[in-house]
Amino acid sequence: MNKKYKCIDCFCGAGGLCLGLIQAGFDILYSFDIEVKAIATIKANPKYFKNHKAETRDIYDVETAGLLESLNLNSGELDLLAGGPPCQGFSVQRIGADLDERNHLVEEYISKVIAIRPKMFILENVPGIEGKRGKNILHSALAKVEESGYFIHEKILDAQDYGVPQRRRRVVIVGERKDHKFPLFEYPKPQEHKITVREAIAYLPEPPEDGSDHPHISLHRRDRLSAKNIARLQALKPGQGRDFLPPELLADCHKVSSKIIGHRNVYGRMPWDDVAPTITARFDSFTRGMFGHPEQNRSISLREGAILQTFPEDFVFVGNKVEVARQIGNAVPVAMAMAVGIQIKKCLDKWNN
């Protein structure tokens, strides 16, 4: 069926989930996020978000009845509610994350699901949400939505299995309203071919030496690196991290005990012939991970990071360097969102038949 199913995206960020769902055949009626620059990014891309209403809003301020009325919908009529509540509070890498107020955004999102009663919903988050920090919050919220009449599907997906040139594990929870006796949704099957870093970004020309944008490719520029950081990159082959640095190039903290201090892939180069590591909100610095270019003596550019997240090459991002890196690193990879969206659309097609 070619029916366009209606969707609302909460916590839309720069629009990775939105764009993937659009590519899967959904009509995004409305999206919102608390980040001003993220909404500006969506509005700066009319090529990809036609007739798309996006607003800066806090989910706690979104009144469900008013939202549905503004979209000419009643409770129970929406096809899909999508959302990936900010996940930093569930990250196993963050000290003090147990107390992060954002942990409770999952509960608020589920309360919106129960009030809106979409036919289906998506909840995407980091695997840590199923661990010590998130398990109680998540299971309590899912129990409520299950009691309200939903089948719950829960699985950890790796983006590299769905056309994303990146190793990125995420919990993808899909809810399916119990309008029929048995659940219909099935997760997408992993693809055999994994897209490598070489396949994804090797075609890009080298950015200008002076740190300016490439004249034909926005956000494709190099950071200035210290002489020592350049020497570190020169000492590494593609796919190597700080474990391969000679002692004189190790950071002082790593000299104390390289085996127990810090992450082992910092100060590293990406591999050419494998998928990239997870693109984080700080991917613009190779001191934060294996984010050095495979062969050029620089960190990967913002544009390269966006491509590794499967955003189109001409996708516009609004904000300064830090803001754009955060938007890219926090996004749901477009190709993975599309793969899940296609399966949800198949489920809705079966529903209508």
Protein language model regions, located:
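Class I S-adenosyl-L-methionine
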Residues: 66-78, 88-261
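C-terminal target-recognition/interaction regions appended to catalytic cores
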Residues: 220-353
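Core alpha/beta nucleotide-donor-binding catalytic domains of modification enzymes
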Residues: 2-117, 127-131, 136-139
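Short, small-residue-rich loop/turn micro-motifs
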Residues: 85-87, 177, 283, 312-313
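Short Gly/aromatic-enriched secondary-structure transition segments
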Residues: 45, 188-190, 294-298
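Basic/polar N-terminal segments that are highly enriched at the extreme N-terminus
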Residues: 1-3, 352-353
